Amino acid sequence: MRLCGFICFGTRMAIKLLLLGTGESGKTTIIKQMKILHIQGFSQSERIEKIGHIRNNVHESIHDIVRNMAPLGIALGSAKNAPSQDYILRCGAGGPPHYDEEYFDHVRVLWRDAGVRECFKRSNEYQLIDSAEYFLDRIDLLEKPDYMPSDADILRCRQKTSGIQKIEFKVKVPKSMHGGIQDFWMFDVGGQRGERKKWIQVFEGIHAIWFLVACSDFDQTLREDSTTNRLKEALTLFEDVWQSRFLLEAGLIVFLNKQDLLQRKVERGGSIAAHFPQYRAWTGPGGEYQRTRDFIRQMFVDVTQKQRQRALPPSSAERFVVGAAWRARECYFHYTTATDTDNVRTVFRDTHQIILTHALSNIGVY
């Protein structure tokens, strides 16, 4: 039996949170938000360290857009911009030797080009980081010699997660739940297929799972498999997590993430129906964005309502009841934008009590 760590037990053990989800679902952004909200944010040295990564994101963005123009049959809006296109392509995927004035001038020229913008609008047809538009719109700021990344810049900086990351922080416990301070350990593991074999290393003793879904990815494919839809992969992965016998005792909270990008994509004409035909029969209320987000939520709710297909270990079977044989298990859903600190603060406050209640209920206290 696991204790959740309250004073009444004579010790204060950490509540362990595990972030799960496919690649680029926003898990690492949540880790950064916890640092902002609970560990005094980023130091000067950490901000300086991010400058290079952010400029690498700029190059990755413009290079990926430009190199996909020919395969998509898109020409430059102006032929006079061809030298800038050639310059970026010659830099290759690794970027230029130096991020100097010449480099940023070429990026600026291309980002203003109508053909480049058209290719950007079709970015669901190739791989492009979510923060491409954000950083390319800020070229004038990012090229300055005295540029210092803001929290917003760092939150949007994309670096692939490899292995296991851990962050520790403390949170005040509501007076209604005995008060005091609670330690939290949050684990982030890489979400791409090649990283998932490492997940089992952190399953032991997990109190709650935050499963992140990139809702705006409904029309995109995986980086590691161009034949698989990202949202369909998330649904499959979520079902595996939901049915895993190693995680039966962990509370489960689903973050339907990237709502800002989802809304923007829908408002620009993107439709989930082309990839999920069952959406055409969806009768939910509201405008197209609300209907789309609620439809995605319902697909994940449907997973939780399926009968568990994997047998429980004999030693645990007597502890779980659902209908005739399966455990009743709640799953909570939140619409989130992981890059929005105020949104994450609100959601964490709401989920904090859920997590504590779940931990207490596991030991029969609440």
Predicted regions and their residues:
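Conserved GTPase G-domain signal focused on the G5
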Residues: 21, 26-27, 338-355
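PEST-like, low-complexity acidic/proline-rich intrinsically disordered segments
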Residues: 1-9
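Conserved beta-strand scaffold positions in the cores of enzyme catalytic domains, especially
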Residues: 17, 331-335
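Switch- and interface-adjacent substructures of P-loop NTPase systems
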Residues: 8-11, 37-250, 258-329, 339-344, ...
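Glycine-rich phosphate-binding P-loop
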Residues: 16-38
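TerminUS-proximal long segments
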Residues: 255, 326, 335-336, 348
